[in-house]
Amino acid sequence: MGLELYLDLLSQPSRAVYIFAKKNGIPFQLRTVDLLKGQHLSEQFSQVNCLKKVPVLKDGSFVLTESTAILIYLSSKYQVADHWYPADLQARAQVHEYLGWHADNIRGTFGVLLWTKVLGPLIGVQVPEEKVERNRNSMVLALQRLEDKFLRDRAFIAGQQVTLADLMSLEELIQPVALGCNLFEGRPQLTAWRERVEAFLGAELCQEAHNPIMSVLGQAAKKTLPVPPPEAHASMMLRIARIP
Ligand SMILES: N[C@@H](CCC(=O)N[C@@H](CS)C(=O)NCC(=O)O)C(=O)O
């Protein structure tokens, strides 16, 4: 069996892995794990990842979780262009500098709107307005720091070329945009960065990867999204309760 990627394109880190593999012509079998249908909770998927999360890479008997580990594995195994994950020590360290900051400040912050606007209501849970407001402020602060500390006068997050950092970042920042919160508005520096990254990746690939999340709000309004099965509700409610 060749390379298998277990993904759901509603998931930010899954999209980063998908886009990376596609952009670099890496052959893989897509194993879609539909989170809304609770497929990640199935016994079958638990055998692949006992953490019950996507993305997951399976390369023969080798199983790897965590999107950044997966991206680094793919970069090295398929010898993709150096700019993604530079061999130069300091350039590579800057990619990790961002990814560390990203895990603390971006991941977990920009996905909240999906819970407040779509997933909570889908299972009948309303997120308190004060949490929504707090999240809005956290996003503004994180964007400011992203611009001031990382982008500065550079074309991309970790320098003058596209790296894994840009891909991870873009996929998180797209999530609120899909839900009607265009956080790029009034931020020319960030908008120019987004345009550069998307131009590099190609409009067609971006559209393909972003389609499911871009249509989620419309589907929620039309009530065509599958309601997650009851066994998924407890973990979803826990996730919502953890929103700071
Ligand atoms: N740090 C992990 C995050 C993985 C993760 O949280 N995946 C989410 C989708 S974005 C998931 O599978 N959630 C299912 C659940 O927690 O029940 C990574 O970057 O791969």
Curated annotation (Swiss-Prot):
* Keyword Nucleus tagged: yes
Any one Pfam family match given in the protein's UniProt record, by short name: GST_N
GO-annotated biological processes: glutathione metabolic process; response to salicylic acid
What would be an example GO MF term here?
Answer: glutathione transferase activity
Pull one GO CC term from this UniProt entry. nucleus
List of residues binding glutathione: H40, L41, K53, V54, E66, S67, D104, N105, I106, R107
Q: Where in the cell is it found?
A: Cytoplasm, Cytosol; Nucleus
UniProt entry tagged with the keyword Metal-binding: no
Q: From the UniProt record, list the coiled-coil ranges.
A: none
- Keywords annotated in UniProt: Cytoplasm, Nucleus, Transferase
What this protein is reported to do is described as: Catalyzes the inactivation of reactive sulfate esters in carcinogenic arylmethanols. Highest activity towards ethacrynic acid and cumene hydroperoxide.
PANTHER family (alphabetical):
GLUTATHIONE S-TRANSFERASE THETA-2-RELATED, PTHR43917
Recorded family membership: Belongs to the GST superfamily. Theta family.
Put simply, this protein is called Glutathione S-transferase theta-2
